[in-house]
């Protein structure tokens, strides 16, 4: 859970900016968007396969550039 302790002299805008960074870093919004609607098991499997393929291609591309 994202928590931000606001100091006495800290402005609301700065605290809000820090809170947004923490939320983004923890992936709360992306998780919320992913869980917004029911995802069928077949769709979940396809999404995971696409992500794995994307990671593999990225690793291959990185390896090719290094050579």
Curated annotation (Swiss-Prot):
Keywords: Ribonucleoprotein, Ribosomal protein. It comes from the Bacteria. GO terms for cellular component: ribonucleoprotein complex; ribosome. Pfam families: Ribosomal_S21. GO terms for biological process: translation. InterPro entries: Ribosomal_bS21, Ribosomal_bS21_sf. GO terms for molecular function: structural constituent of ribosome. Belongs to the bacterial ribosomal protein bS21 family. NCBIfam families: S21p. This is Small ribosomal subunit protein bS21. It comes from Hydrogenobaculum sp. (strain Y04AAS1). The gene is rpsU.
């Amino acid at each position: 859970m994202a928590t931000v302790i606001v100091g006495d002299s800290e402005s609301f805008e700065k605290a809000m900016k820090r809170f947004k960074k923490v939320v983004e870093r923890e992936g709360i919004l992306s998780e919320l968007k992913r869980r917004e609607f029911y995802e069928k098991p077949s769709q979940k499997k396809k999404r995971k396969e696409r992500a794995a393929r994307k990671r593999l291609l990225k690793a291959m591309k990185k390896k090719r550039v290094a050579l």
